Amino acid sequence: MNEEKNVYPVGFWNYTHSNVLEVKSAAEDWQQLGMTLAMSSEYEKPEDKQYISDTLDEAQKRGIKVIVCDYRTHWNYYASHTEEEFTKAVKEAIEDFGNHPAFFAFHIGDEPTPGTKTWEDMKGAAK
């Protein structure tokens, strides 16, 4: 529960890529639907940075927090890079988005299978 506003987080799972939806219109829809927590579009390449920043700005105007989907924090990135490369990438992601007032968390992945390499990668990314 968000103690600051006494609001229960209500959100949705966002499957869109960056630059597909018009940010202001999407944020207005989220607000009208009563969303208090949104998942960003996928930040997949450096060109998407401004789109995610704009998403955070529009969400902030409406009192909505955002879970940022950034490839640099995902367990797939962890699995395919060294620990040092992953740590550097996460620090860059935090620098880019982590201090924004609308930032809630990074999405580091989903649906790992316990007892597999995927599960170990997910646990490693979460550290």
Placement of each model-derived feature along the sequence:
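Glycan-processing catalytic domains of CAZymes
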Residues: M1-K127
